[in-house]
C-alpha cells in the first residue's frame, strides 16, 4: 500500500491552487492597466492631432514659413515617444505610423494655406474631438464589460475552489470511515479468537456450577459478539455512504474543473479579443480614417510636388487595421494576454481516478444530467444565436454610421475666388449642427443597445461554454461506459442507384431517402437544430464523395440530417430560386385563388433550367409527403415553409426582410401543397421523381415478394389496402445470430432458431413470435425463408378491392344446428379447404369464394372449430373423444354473445391457418418439408394435425369461457406503450393478422371487448380492427420500437347477433 506521506496534503493542494489563482488575478489586473494605458495613449494621440491641425491652421495663415517649425516640434516629440515605446518598426501601431508619415509631409505644405486653414479649423479638428470623446466613452463601457467578464471568471474559480474543498472533505470522510471499518473487523476477529481461547482454557468444575458458569459466559460472549457485529454493520454502512459521497464529489470536481478550464480558455482566446476588437476599438479606426481622409482630400488638390509624400501617407491610412493593431498589441504584451496553463486534476490522498465515474449507482444520475444539459444547451444556443444576430445587425449599423464616406472636400477647391464661398461650402457639409446633433444622438443610442446585446451575448456564450464542456465530458464518459467489446454482425444491404444520379445531387437524394425511411414522423423535423458536430461530419463525408447515410443503419440523428439538407440548399452558389424571378414569384402570392396562384407560379418557374426544375420537383414532392404526417411530426406545409423558405429563397438586399419573408413563406407553402400542378410531369420533363414507396422498399427481404407497380402506387386506396393485406401474412425466418432482448417486449433467441414474423414494426424491427411468446424481433439478426411455399402469396390490390365490392358467391353453412361439430366434420372442412387453397394461388379469389355471412348459432359453433385451426397448434397426448363434444357444445356456443365468434367465418380461420407458417411447423422435419414442397400428405400426419387442432380449439374456448366474466386486467402490450394521440384508438398486439380484418372492413360491426389476459392464448381470432385509411407504419427508434398508431375507424353499424356497444375509453383490443 502506498504510504500516505507521498500524497499531497490538503493545505499543499489549496496553497498551489491559491498561487495559481493569484497569478491569474494579477494578470487580469495588468490587463486592465494595459488597456488603460492604451486608452491614454489614444487620447493623447487624438489630442496631439487636434493641436497639430489647430496650429497648422494658424501657420497656414502665416504662409509656409512656420510649417517647418511646427513639423520639427512634433517630429521631435514623436521620435522621443517612439524611442521609448516602439523600438521596432513592425511593432508600430497603424495610427502611430500614420502620424509619423503625416509629420514628414508637413515640411512640404506651403500652398493653399487659406483653404487648408479653414478646412483644418472647421472640419478635421472637430472630427478628432468626436473621435476622442467616442473613444473615451467606448473605453469606459468596454472596461465595464471586461470587468464583468473578469468577475465572472473569478466567480468560476471560486466555485472550483469550493467544489475542490467539498471533494477533499468527502474523500477524507471516506478514508476515515474505511479505517474505522477495518478497526471494527480487527476487533471482531480478536473477540472471536478470545472466545476460542477461553473455552480451551476453562478448568473442570462441579457439574452444576460448571453449567451455570458456561451459560453466563456464553451469554456474555454472544452479547459482545452482537455488539461488535452491529458496530461493524454501522461502520460498513457509513463507509458505503461516505464512499458514494466521495465519488459524487470527485465527479462534481472534475466537471467543475473542465468548465473552469473552458471558461479560462474562452476568456483569454475569445473574450479579450472581442473586447479589444469590438468594444475598445469600435469606430476608432474608422473615425480616424475619415478624419485623415478629409485631410488627404484637401492635400491631393495641391501641386504635384506634394504627391510623393501624400502617397506614402495614403498608403499608411489604407493600412489602418484594428485587427493588425490588436495583434501587434498582444505580441508586445505577450505575457499579459497569453492564456494560463490548464488546471489539472489534483488527486487527493491517493485517489488516482482522474476520470468521471459512470458506473452504478451514479450512472443513471449522470445520464439524466447529460440529457438535461443537452436540453438546456439546445435552448441556450438558440437564444444566444438570436442575440448574436441582433448584436451583429446593431454592429453593422454602428459601422455604417462611423464609416460614412463624408471625407471628400474636393468641392472646396472648385475655382473659389473668395474665402466666403469656401466657408459656406464647408459649413454646409460636415459641421451642419442639426445634422450632426441628430447623427450623434442616433449613434449613442445605437451604441448603448449594442453594448447591452454584446454583454448579454458574452454572458450567454460563457454559460454555454461551461455547460458544453460538462455535457461533452459526460457524453464521452457515458459513451465509453456503454461500449461493448464485441460488435454484432449486421445485415449488409445494397444501395440502389438511380440511372440519372447526376440529376439529383447525392446529398439531396441520400438525405431525403433517409428521412423518408426513418423520419417522416419525427417531431420537429427541419425545425429543431441538430448536433453541429454530426452535421459537419456528414457534410464532410458527402464532400469526399461518400454516402454516410447508405444502408439500413439508423444511428444518425434525424435533426442533424435535416440540418445537412437545409445547409446544402442554403450554401448553393446559385440558389434554386434566382433573385431575378423574386418579384414575379412574390406577385403570385397576392392571388387569393390557390389554383390560379399555382398556374402563375408554374409559368414563372418554367423559365428555369431543366436540372433546377428536376431538383425542385423532387424536393417539393418529398416535402409534400412529409407534411402529410403533420399530426405526428408537427410540421404542416406552413411550418415547413418557415423552416425551408430562408434556405431556398433569400430576400434580396434593399427589401424589408420581415414583410418579404412572410411572402416567401406563403410561396413555399403553396408550392408544397400544389407541387403536382406546378412542376411538369415525367412525360413533360424527364428525370428522377420522388417515390413515396421509397421509404418501404427494404421492408421485405423475401426474393419472392411482389412489388407494387408504379401505376398502382399512385392510387392511395389500392396502396393502403395492399399494405393492410401484407401485414396479415406471417413469414417464417431463421435467426442469423444470438440475440438477448433488452426490454420485456424484445424476444431472445439463439442462432438457427425458427421465428414467425407477423408484420413490420419499423425498418429495424418485426412483430413476431418465438417459443409461443409474442414480441419484437430485430430485422438485422434474421434471414427470411426463401422456399417455394415459404412466402405467402399476395394478391394484387386491384383484385382485392374488386372482391370487396362484389357479393359472396359461395357460403359455407354449418352441418349441425345447435350442436358443435364432431371431429370428423372438422377434418373434412380442413382437408377440403387445404385443397382449395392449393388450387387457388390468388388470395383474393379465396377470400371471394369463402366469405361467409352466417351469424347464427350453428355458424358460431362451426367457427369455433375453425378458430382452432387458425390458432397455434398445441401438441396433446390425450385424444378428444367424440362423445365429449356435444356435452361441451352448448357452453362453447354461448361464448359468441360476448366473444364475437359469430363474426369469424370459416374461410377466415382456414385461410389464416394456411397463411400461417405454423402449419408447416410440426413435430418432424419431414412433415414441414412435405407441406412446403406439396408432396402427398401422410394420413397419420393429417390425423395428428387434426387431433392437435381440435384439442387446441377446445382448450382455447374453455379458456375464453373462463375469462369472459373475469375482471379486466391490464394488457401487457397496451399498458406499456405510450398513450395514443387519438381516442378511441385500437392498439395492435403482437399476434399475427388474420383475414378477419378484410371481412370487418367489408361488413363493419361493433367492436367487442375481451379480457387482455387472453391475448397470448388466442393466436389468430382476436385481432384489433385495422382502419382502411392508413397513412404509413410508424418508424420508431431502434432502441424501443413503437406500434403503429391507427386512425379512428368509422365502423358503427351493429352486427346481426351483437347487442354490445363499443367502449371508446377502454384500451382492450376489439374484434
Curated annotation (Swiss-Prot):
InterPro entries, alphabetized: AH/BAR_dom_sf, F_BAR, FCH_dom, Rho_GTPase_activation_prot, RhoGAP_dom, SH3-like_dom_sf, SH3_domain, SLIT-ROBO_RhoGAP
Residues covered by the SH3 domain: 728-787
PROSITE patterns: F_BAR, RHOGAP, SH3
Annotated site residue numbers, Arginine finger: 527
Pfam families for the chain: FCH, RhoGAP, SH3_1
Modified residues annotated as Symmetric dimethylarginine in this record: 927
Keyword Kinase: no
Subcellular location(s) of the protein: Cell membrane; Cell projection, Dendritic spine; Postsynaptic density; Postsynaptic cell membrane
Signal peptide: none
Domain F-BAR: 22-325
Any one biological process term the GO annotation gives: positive regulation of GTPase activity
Broad class of where this protein is predominantly found: membrane
One Gene Ontology molecular-function label: GTPase activator activity
Entry's transmembrane regions: none
GO CC aspect terms: cytosol; dendritic spine; dendritic spine head; glutamatergic synapse; lamellipodium; mitochondrial inner membrane; nucleus; phagocytic vesicle
Residues forming coiled coils: 363-401, 940-968
Biased composition (Polar residues): 705-717, 874-885, 897-907, 1047-1071
Keyword Hydrolase part of the UniProt annotation: no
Recorded domain comment: The F-BAR domain mediates oligomerization, binds membranes, and induces plasma membrane protrusions.
Task performed by this protein: Postsynaptic RAC1 GTPase activating protein (GAP) that plays a key role in neuronal morphogenesis and migration mainly during development of the cerebral cortex. Regulates excitatory and inhibitory synapse maturation and density in cortical pyramidal neurons.
Assembly and binders: Homodimer. Forms a heterooligomer with SRGAP1 and SRGAP3 through its F-BAR domain. Interacts (via SH3 domain) with GPHN. Interacts (via SH3 domain) with FMNL1 (activated by RAC1); regulates the actin filament severing activity of FMNL1 and actin dynamics. Interacts (via SH3 domain) with FMNL3. Interacts with RAC1; specifically stimulates RAC1 GTPase activity. Interacts (via F-BAR domain) with HOMER1. Interacts with ROBO1 and ROBO2. Interacts with FASLG. Interacts with PRMT5.
Protein name in UniProt: SLIT-ROBO Rho GTPase-activating protein 2
Organism from which the protein derives: Mus musculus (Mouse)
Amino acid at each position: 500500500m502506498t504510504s500516505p506521506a507521498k500524497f499531497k496534503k490538503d493545505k499543499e493542494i489549496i496553497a498551489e491552487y491559491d498561487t495559481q489563482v493569484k497569478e491569474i488575478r494579477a494578470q487580469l489586473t495588468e490587463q486592465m492597466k494595459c488597456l488603460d494605458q492604451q486608452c491614454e495613449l489614444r487620447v493623447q494621440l487624438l489630442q496631439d492631432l487636434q493641436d497639430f491641425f489647430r496650429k497648422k491652421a494658424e501657420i497656414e495663415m502665416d504662409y509656409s514659413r512656420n510649417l517647418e517649425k511646427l513639423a520639427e516640434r512634433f517630429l521631435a516629440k514623436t521620435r522621443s515617444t517612439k524611442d521609448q515605446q516602439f523600438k521596432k518598426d513592425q511593432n508600430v501601431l497603424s495610427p502611430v505610423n500614420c502620424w509619423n508619415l503625416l509629420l514628414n509631409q508637413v515640411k512640404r505644405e506651403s500652398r493653399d494655406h487659406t483653404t487648408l486653414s479653414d478646412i483644418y479649423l472647421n472640419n478635421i479638428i472637430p472630427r478628432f474631438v468626436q473621435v476622442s470623446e467616442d473613444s473615451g466613452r467606448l473605453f469606459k463601457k468596454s472596461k465595464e464589460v471586461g470587468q464583468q467578464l473578469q468577475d465572472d471568471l473569478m466567480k468560476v474559480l471560486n466555485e472550483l475552489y469550493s467544489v475542490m474543498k467539498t471533494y477533499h472533505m468527502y474523500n477524507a470522510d471516506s478514508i476515515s470511515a474505511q479505517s474505522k471499518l477495518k478497526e471494527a473487523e480487527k476487533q471482531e476477529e480478536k473477540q472471536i479468537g478470545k472466545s476460542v481461547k477461553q473455552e480451551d482454557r476453562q478448568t473442570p468444575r462441579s457439574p452444576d456450577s460448571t453449567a451455570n458458569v458456561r451459560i453466563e459466559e456464553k451469554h456474555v460472549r454472544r452479547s459482545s459478539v452482537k455488539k461488535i457485529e452491529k458496530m461493524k454493520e454501522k461502520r460498513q454502512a457509513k463507509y458505503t455512504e461516505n464512499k458514494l459521497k466521495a465519488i459524487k464529489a470527485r465527479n462534481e470536481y472534475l466537471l467543475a474543473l473542465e468548465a473552469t478550464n473552458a471558461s479560462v480558455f474562452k476568456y483569454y482566446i475569445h473574450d479579450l479579443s472581442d473586447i479589444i476588437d469590438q468594444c475598445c476599438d469600435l469606430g476608432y479606426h474608422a473615425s480616424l480614417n475619415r478624419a485623415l481622409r478629409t485631410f488627404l482630400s484637401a492635400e491631393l488638390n495641391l501641386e504635384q510636388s506634394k504627391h510623393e509624400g501624400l502617397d506614402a501617407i495614403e498608403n499608411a491610412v489604407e493600412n489602418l487595421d484594428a485587427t493588425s493593431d490588436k495583434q501587434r498589441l498582444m505580441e508586445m504584451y505577450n505575457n499579459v494576454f497569453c492564456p494560463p496553463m490548464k488546471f489539472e486534476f489534483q488527486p487527493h490522498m491517493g485517489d488516482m481516478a482522474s476520470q468521471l465515474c459512470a458506473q452504478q449507482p451514479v450512472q443513471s444520475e449522470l445520464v439524466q444530467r447529460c440529457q438535461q444539459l443537452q436540453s438546456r444547451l439546445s435552448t441556450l444556443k438558440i437564444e444566444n444565436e438570436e442575440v448574436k444576430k441582433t448584436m451583429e445587425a446593431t454592429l453593422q449599423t454602428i459601422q455604417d454610421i462611423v464609416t460614412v464616406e463624408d471625407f471628400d472636400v474636393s468641392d472646396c477647391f472648385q475655382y473659389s475666388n473668395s474665402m466666403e464661398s469656401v466657408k459656406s461650402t464647408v459649413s454646409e457639409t460636415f459641421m451642419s449642427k442639426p445634422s450632426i446633433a441628430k447623427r450623434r444622438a442616433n449613434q449613442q443610442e445605437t451604441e448603448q443597445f449594442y453594448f447591452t446585446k454584446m454583454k448579454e451575448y458574452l454572458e450567454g456564450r460563457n454559460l454555454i461554454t461551461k455547460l458544453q464542456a460538462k455535457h461533452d465530458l459526460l457524453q464521452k464518459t457515458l459513451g465509453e461506459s456503454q461500449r461493448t467489446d464485441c460488435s454484432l454482425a449486421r445485415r449488409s444491404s445494397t444501395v440502389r442507384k438511380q440511372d440519372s444520379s447526376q440529376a439529383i445531387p447525392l446529398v439531396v437524394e441520400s438525405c431525403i431517402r433517409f428521412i423518408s425511411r426513418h423520419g417522416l414522423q419525427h417531431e420537429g423535423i427541419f425545425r429543431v437544430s441538430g448536433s453541429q458536430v454530426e452535421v459537419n461530419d456528414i457534410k464532410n463525408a458527402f464532400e469526399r464523395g461518400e454516402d454516410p447515410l447508405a444502408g439500413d443503419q439508423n444511428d444518425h440523428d434525424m435533426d442533424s440530417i435535416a440540418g445537412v439538407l437545409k445547409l446544402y440548399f442554403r450554401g448553393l452558389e446559385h440558389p434554386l430560386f434566382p433573385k431575378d424571378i423574386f418579384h414575379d414569384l412574390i406577385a403570385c402570392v397576392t392571388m387569393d385563388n390557390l389554383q390560379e396562384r399555382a398556374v402563375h407560379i408554374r409559368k414563372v418557374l418554367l423559365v428555369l433550367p431543366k436540372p433546377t426544375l428536376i431538383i425542385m420537383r423532387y424536393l417539393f414532392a418529398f416535402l409534400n409527403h412529409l407534411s402529410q404526417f403533420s399530426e405526428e411530426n408537427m410540421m404542416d406545409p406552413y411550418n415547413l415553409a418557415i423552416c425551408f423558405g430562408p434556405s431556398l429563397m433569400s430576400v434580396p438586399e434593399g427589401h424589408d426582410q420581415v414583410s418579404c419573408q412572410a411572402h416567401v413563406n406563403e410561396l413555399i407553402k403553396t408550392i408544397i401543397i400544389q407541387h403536382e400542378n406546378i412542376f411538369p410531369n415525367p412525360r413533360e420533363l424527364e428525370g428522377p421523381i420522388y417515390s413515396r414507396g421509397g421509404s418501404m422498399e427494404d421492408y421485405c427481404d423475401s426474393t419472392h415478394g411482389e412489388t407494387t407497380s408504379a401505376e398502382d402506387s399512385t392510387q392511395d386506396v389500392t396502396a393502403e389496402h395492399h399494405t393492410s393485406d401484407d401485414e396479415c401474412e406471417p413469414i417464417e425466418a431463421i435467426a442469423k445470430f444470438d440475440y438477448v432482448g433488452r426490454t420485456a417486449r424484445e424476444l431472445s433467441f439463439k442462432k438457427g432458431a425458427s421465428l414467425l414474423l407477423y408484420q413490420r414494426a419499423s425498418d429495424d424491427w418485426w412483430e413476431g413470435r418465438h417459443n409461443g411468446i409474442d414480441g419484437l424481433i430485430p430485422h438485422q439478426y434474421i434471414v427470411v425463408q426463401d422456399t417455394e411455399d415459404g412466402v405467402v402469396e399476395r394478391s394484387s390490390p386491384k383484385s382485392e378491392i374488386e372482391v370487396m365490392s362484389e357479393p359472396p358467391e359461395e357460403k359455407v353453412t354449418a352441418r349441425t344446428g345447435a350442436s358443435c361439430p364432431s371431429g370428423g366434420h372438422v377434418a373434412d372442412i380442413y382437408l377440403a379447404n387445404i385443397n382449395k387453397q392449393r388450387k387457388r394461388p390468388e388470395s383474393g379469389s379465396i377470400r371471394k369464394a369463402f366469405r361467409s355471412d352466417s351469424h347464427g348459432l350453428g355458424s358460431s359453433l362451426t367457427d369455433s372449430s375453425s378458430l382452432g385451426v387458425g390458432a397455434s397448434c398445441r401438441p396433446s397426448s390425450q385424444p378428444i373423444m367424440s362423445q365429449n363434444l356435444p356435452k361441451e357444445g352448448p357452453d362453447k356456443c354461448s361464448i359468441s354473445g360476448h366473444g364475437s365468434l359469430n363474426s369469424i367465418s370459416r374461410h377466415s380461420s382456414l385461410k389464416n391457418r394456411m397463411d400461417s407458417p405454423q402449419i408447416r411447423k410440426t413435430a418432424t422435419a419431414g412433415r414441414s418439408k412435405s407441406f412446403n414442397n406439396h408432396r402427398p400428405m401422410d394420413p397419420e400426419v393429417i390425423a395428428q394435425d387434426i387431433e392437435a387442432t381440435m384439442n387446441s380449439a377446445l382448450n382455447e374456448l374453455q379458456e375464453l369461457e373462463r375469462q369472459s366474466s373475469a375482471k379486466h386486467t391490464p394488457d401487457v402490450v397496451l399498458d406499456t406503450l405510450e398513450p395514443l394521440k387519438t381516442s378511441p384508438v385500437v392498439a395492435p398486439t403482437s399476434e399475427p393478422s388474420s383475414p378477419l380484418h378484410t371481412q370487418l372492413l367489408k361488413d363493419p360491426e361493433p367492436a367487442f371487448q375481451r379480457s387482455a389476459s387472453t391475448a397470448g392464448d388466442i393466436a389468430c381470432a382476436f385481432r384489433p380492427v385495422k382502419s382502411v385509411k392508413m397513412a404509413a407504419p410508424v418508424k420508431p427508434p431502434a432502441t424501443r420500437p413503437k406500434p403503429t398508431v391507427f386512425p379512428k375507424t368509422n365502423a358503427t353499424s351493429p352486427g346481426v347477433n351483437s347487442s354490445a356497444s363499443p367502449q371508446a375509453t377502454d384500451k382492450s383490443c376489439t374484434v
